[in-house]
C-alpha cells in the first residue's frame, strides 16, 4: 500500500510545534480528532521532548534513531516503536527516508472497560519487530497501514474506522 500525504491542512499542525522546556503540546487541526498521523520525510531531528500522547513510529524507507532513557534504538524499515505518554525521547532521522509518525491521545479509550489495564500496559515503550514479537508483528504492521489509509481518506467514517483499528492495535 502506498502512503499518500494528507492535505497540508491536516498535517501542517506538526510543523507548528509548541514547546515549553521539554514539553511538546500537541495541537490537532480537527478539534474532535485526537489522532494525528504524519508521513515524515524531513531530515530535521526532534530534540529531547515529551508529550501527553502516545507516539507510534514506523520507518517506511531507511531507518530512524530514537533515544529514550539514555538508550539509543536504531529502528529498521517497518519496525514499530510505541512510546508512552510522558516519556522523554529524542528523534534523529537519516539524511533521507520516510517514516510514519502517529500521535494518539489515549483518553480516547478512557470510557472503555479495561482502560486502566490498557493504560498500565502502555506505561513503558514497546518495540514490535519480526524478532521481538513475531506473533503479532505482521498484524500490527497491517493495522498501521490501514490506519494510514483511513487517515488519508478523511471522510465521515474515517475517524470511527481509525478508532476501531487503534483498539485492535493496542489490544493485540
Where are these regions (language model features)?
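A hydrophobic/aromatic-rich effector-binding and dimerization subdomain
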Residues: 2-35, 88-152, 171-172
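N-terminal regulatory/effector-sensing and dimerization cores
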Residues: 33-123, 154-160
Amino acid at each position: 500500500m502506498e502512503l499518500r500525504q494528507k492535505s497540508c491542512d491536516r498535517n501542517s499542525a506538526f510543523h507548528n510545534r509548541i514547546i515549553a522546556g521539554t514539553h511538546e503540546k500537541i495541537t490537532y487541526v480537527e478539534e474532535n480528532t485526537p489522532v494525528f498521523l504524519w508521513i515524515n520525510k524531513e531530515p530535521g531531528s526532534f530534540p529531547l521532548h515529551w508529550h501527553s500522547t502516545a507516539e507510534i513510529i514506523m520507518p517506511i524507507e531507511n531507518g530512524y534513531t530514537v533515544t529514550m532513557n539514555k538508550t539509543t534504538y536504531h529502528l529498521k524499515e517497518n519496525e514499530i516503536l510505541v512510546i508512552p505518554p510522558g516519556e522523554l525521547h529524542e528523534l534523529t532521522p537519516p539524511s533521507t527516508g520516510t517514516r510514519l509518525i502517529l500521535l494518539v491521545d489515549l483518553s480516547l479509550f478512557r470510557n472503555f472497560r479495561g482502560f486502566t489495564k490498557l493504560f498500565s500496559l502502555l506505561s513503558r515503550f514497546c518495540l514490535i519487530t519480526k524478532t521481538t514479537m513475531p506473533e503479532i508483528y505482521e498484524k500490527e504492521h497491517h493495522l498501521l497501514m490501514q490506519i494510514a489509509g483511513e487517515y488519508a481518506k478523511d471522510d465521515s467514517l474515517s475517524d470511527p474506522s481509525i478508532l476501531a483499528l487503534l483498539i485492535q492495535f493496542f489490544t493485540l
